Amino acid sequence: MILVSAKQAESAAVQARLTTEQLKQDHQLANMDMIMRLYEFANSAEVQAAWLTVLTARISSYEDFQKLPKSDQVAFYQIGALFESLGVLVEREIVTVQIVEDMFLTQLAWESMKPFVAGVRQRFGEEESYAAFERLHERILTK
């Protein structure tokens, strides 16, 4: 009887270990899937067009941003939202800062977007606008 109980306990321990390993693998696959979807989104024609607009606009102030056509202004909001989302994912440890750094040009995005972010914060009185994007930028700088 004791031998049977010991075997049952051993089997339960093996099952628990295997289940834990399976859950870890499922979590890794889900994260990898999310990262690939983000990357696919970031490489869509719409986002790439927005990225090109932000890079070529070369704004040096919020006033420069306001002079842009509305479609170009929307590009800044799109890229800002993308990097804000990436910052939140890093802060919540859903993706690592290393993955974001490997896959996206965060520093270039921040430098191109800084006048826009400062202007949005001032205009709307909301210091938290694009805060996760800024923290992501700072985290990469201090790595």
Spell out what each predicted region is:
Residues M1-S60, K70:
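Membrane-proximal alpha-helical anchors
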Residues Y39-F41, Y62, Y77, Y130:
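Sequence-level detector for tyrosine residue identity
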Residues S60-E63, Q107-L108:
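Intrinsically disordered cytosolic tails
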Residues P69-K143:
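An amphipathic alpha-helical interaction surface
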